[in-house]
């Protein structure tokens, strides 16, 4: 439900305010992307705390204050759930929402306008996979259902930018990030 994460962020903000008052420096909290850190961080956590359900039981850790990528929730639910964290990251943040590529443009526009009304800087995630052998396109595929090829190019959002998660079947991304991409439902 995010209650503990909210409690932690409120505590961190309180400490930041205390330090600002104490030394006069301007500190900020950034809702950070960590594409390469997601695998390393879970290993470090497990070394100290072991495997904890819903925290370190996957080969990656999700970024920042976002709902877990595997949550089966609508874009509106995701906006509503993440809103409570928004003002706690005063140094920068982005909210990611996954829209199926076949969404109608009026629906996408409505959701973006809703996000803007809520004060979000929202990244719209539109994934695409295509077969380099026959040209077939789908939202997400590991093997082309038309010709059986694994020679695919896949485009996914990578923490603020669109990136090739596969080019001609190969990837430059670490295994933890590829596992996170595979689990994506709401992000």
Predicted segments with their positions:
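Long, C-terminal-biased catalytic regions of enzyme "large/alpha" subunits
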Residues: 1-187
């Amino acid at each position: 439900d995010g209650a503990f994460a909210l409690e932690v962020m409120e505590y961190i903000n309180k400490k930041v305010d205390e330090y600002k008052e104490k030394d006069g420096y301007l500190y900020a909290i950034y809702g950070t992307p960590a594409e390469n850190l997601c695998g390393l961080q879970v290993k470090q956590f497990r070394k100290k705390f072991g495997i904890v359900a819903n925290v370190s039981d996957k080969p990656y850790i999700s970024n920042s204050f976002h709902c877990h990528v595997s949550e089966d929730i609508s874009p509106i639910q995701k906006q509503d759930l993440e809103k409570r964290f928004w003002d706690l990251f005063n140094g920068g943040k982005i909210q990611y929402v996954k829209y199926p590529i076949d969404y109608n443009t009026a629906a996408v526009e409505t959701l973006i306008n809703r996000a803007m009304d809520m004060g979000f800087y929202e990244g719209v995630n539109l994934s695409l996979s295509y077969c380099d052998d026959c040209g077939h396109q789908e939202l997400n595929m590991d093997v082309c259902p038309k010709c059986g090829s694994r020679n695919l190019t896949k485009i996914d959002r990578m923490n603020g930018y669109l990136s090739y998660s596969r080019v001609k079947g190969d990837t430059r991304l670490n295994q933890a990030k590829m596992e996170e991409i595979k689990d994506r439902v709401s992000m």
